[in-house]
């Protein structure tokens, strides 16, 4: 099933209703569908315009692909991310879910009818259409991903799976744009998803313990859309302060997860195992402790319209020249052997990408913040750590550590940490 906008939400609801025996809002209405629905594609979908039995639409054991454009002036928040999170894999079959977030895509150009005017006439004249991809380019993204998704899910062609795991595999096939993708399959074994309780030292995996040191920010919280509405997804925010040269030795900031048991999909860690997590730049500023009151005063003045214009320009220039955040991943085996690699070795942290939907100077009252944190899935093969550190035995892995000793200070959002079978699983 494929749906666009409200049709994207409807496709997911149909996927749920297909397996129900009665209508959730009136049990007197019986269902007898049982179609062979194996895959759902949602293009810039809405979410929870209809809530079966007053609840968000649940979905399980089905393949799911969702698209969203960062310049969608109609569904301006990534509502499909909520359905993505709600989809669970509970049986023994192979399933996967994937999402693709494209910076210069709007709402309407994924089809040939709605076009580049997400508001319609006459108000559409104030939309920032200069930022958009050409309509054919935007539909090329859809053609490539949808055809590959159908080949994979309906024809069982596993050779297309890599493009859902990492958009860079087919970068030459896609229009010039910024892409962020997520991927999770039914081999994924979750260690931390931050949904289980309010204790920041416990993990989703029984017996696992979380610790942190020298962190300027460490909190578990609900992730928000640009509009401040809930994504219904708890994550952890981690921040570190100061220059990289100051973050060494006893001042080293890190976030650590220690496992008391082996959660590997195959029963034990191997060279083929992938360490998986989702991450995004939070775009949060860390004030120095003694400057917190001063910074708050500045924010208050800005809200009152009294900010110094020169200072504002300097801040905008600084924001524009920001380098992507950097960190390293350290794995520690049961015997204490360590293997540490930069995340850039696998994929850099995406820079903050801000959207301007209209030509008017203040659009925040309609759209909220210019930046909406969108998670990117990272896949780190344990084999790469083994290659760099021959003494490291992936089979004895017990500690995963996120180490913040590189680059500038900043705050990241982290979620869905775990392990998955290798990339050749379906090939």
Task: Name these PLM-found stretches.
Residues 1-58:
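Primarily recognizes the serine-hydrolase "nucleophile elbow" in alpha/beta-hydrolase
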Residues 11-15, 26, 51-56, 75-80, ...:
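Short, solvent-exposed loop/turn and secondary-structure capping segments
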Residues 41, 65-67, 98-100, 192, ...:
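Hydrophobic/aromatic beta-strand patches that form the interior of the parallel beta-sheet core
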Residues 57-136:
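Active-site-adjacent alpha-helix of alpha/beta-hydrolase-fold enzymes
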Residues 103-108, 113-264, 270-275, 281, ...:
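Alpha/beta-hydrolase-fold serine-hydrolase catalytic core, especially in secreted/extracellular enzymes
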Residues 243-272, 276-389, 405-426:
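Extracellular ligand-binding interfaces
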Residues 390-401:
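Noncatalytic modules at the cell exterior or secretory-pathway interfaces
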